[in-house]
Amino acid sequence: MPLDPGCLNGRVMKCLTFFLLLPETLKKSRKSARAQGKVQACYEIVPLALKKKMAAELYPASANTNIANSNATANAKKNALQLQHTAPPPPQLHNLNNNNIESSNWQSFHPTLRERNALMFNNELMADVHFIVGPAGASKKVPAHKYILAVGSSVFYAMFYGDLAEVKSEIHIPDVEPAAFLILLKYLYSDEIDLEADTVLATLYAAKKYIVPALAKACVNFLETSLEAKNACVLLSQSRLFEEPDLTLRCWEVIDAQAELALKSEGFCEIDLPTLEIIVTRETLNTKEDVVFEAVLNWAEAECKRQGLPITPVNKRNVLGKALYLVRIPTMTLEEFANGAAQSDILTLEETRSIFLWYTAANKPQLEFPLIKRKGLAPQRCHRFQSSAYRSNQWRYRGRCDSIQFAVDKRIFIAGLGLYGSSCGKAEYSVKIELKRQGVVLAQNLTKFVSDGCSNTFSVWFEHPVQVEQDTFYTVSAILDGNELSYFGQEGMTEVQCGKVTFQFQCSSDSTNGTGVQGGQIPELIFYA
């Protein structure tokens, strides 16, 4: 097409304006073409507004720069490219889907390597592998980046860069929950750990599967912190599966000290048979044998349901197997046996008859059940006074509160209090004891005890031992009602070493009967450790 002469005259300035806006590389190419004798054709006259837009695209301004047009700002306010002085905030790192990157210059808004990697978590941008996570029908497709995964996990390294590297672009992982897998990936991308009670066990499994020890340790710490009687048996089963000895030890501490609560929990019925056998064999379970027997029956009923079997005595015996003969039935009292196990129908008539004879006959029959009573746990006592005394008209229980605060340096289980009784002979007291943490009542008991007039303390127990965490102050209180004068403690100590546990004491504002650190009542704390 021949060149229009007008382009060399009236429109030459417009062509020059456009030329000045071109990148240097393009200018050089035009100069090179001119040097070879080629004439550059002006194919289109570009409007000024479009030139401005093209210039903005070719030379993007920095985040703190405005391109101003002094002649057209007012008229083109809605259409001109507006650059903000303040950079938009970076996406939140906890967002589980980062497929919302709008800026082509997103790297500028994330100055650290961790932030930039975190932005790639669960992001399709540059993803070079996808995981189909979860069982069929409940799976989720998760994008990922091989390099980041391989840097954080030796399993992923072998999967992507080892001698038998995976070549498929989609990898199926049916044995890991999607939520747990996302928590694992989030840690590998950003070092962030977001654990919840509902997913922590599944996350521990994923961390173990892909050998990410730091995440596994965080899961174990989370479980130890949230451990209590209602979930201790389930966690014991899982700790054995995951081979976590520290968690196993913590589970046993709770199960031993709070055995009745643990055995009566719903979680106990969810454990596997080997874990059931280990628990029932335990020598240090701190509970009565009829509680153990009832728990075993509850487990058998739940197992029948899991296996789709009718709940009958025969099926219960079958699912229990030898576990039934681990219960120490002969160590029950005769009354406990007669009102419980003897009427359960799970024992044969011959077994029931033999056990009754074992209780009553001089010539006792042979039994298949263990005969030796469990040892349980030996309670320990922390004495906070160095001496005790009594004086006429000195100390009297009149229904007012004696209270003290304490803290320990390791986790224990408070079982009860040791209290002073009458200094004037035999006397009966009604007593209410209470344990609180930050004003919240954790346990209380209302009972009576009889004092014989000596200076020894008398034990008053909570219904169940209460777990007490370290480095936190708790308040114990006792309200006694009686007419007689009582003994009281002197030379109180602010710190007491009791075995491996260190107690610290301080005065309580709840105390209205004179008890404090230096003297008064509540001389003993009874605990398991």
UniProtKB/Swiss-Prot annotation:
InterPro entries: BACK, BTB/POZ_dom, BTB_POZ_BTBD6, PHR, PHR_sf, SKP1/BTB/POZ_sf. Residues 127-197 form the BTB domain. Disruption phenotype: Embryos show strong defects in late neuronal markers and strongly reduced and disorganized axons while early neural development is unaffected. Muscle development is also affected. It comes from the Eukaryota. GO terms for cellular component: cytosol. Keywords: Cytoplasm. GO terms for biological process: neurogenesis. Its main location: cytoplasm. Gene3D superfamilies: 1.25.40.420, PHR domain (2.60.120.820), Potassium Channel Kv1.1, Chain A (3.30.710.10). It is found in: Cytoplasm. Homodimer and heterodimer. Interacts with cul3 via the BTB domain. Adapter protein for the cul3 E3 ubiquitin-protein ligase complex. Involved in late neuronal development and muscle formation. This is BTB/POZ domain-containing protein 6. It comes from Xenopus laevis.
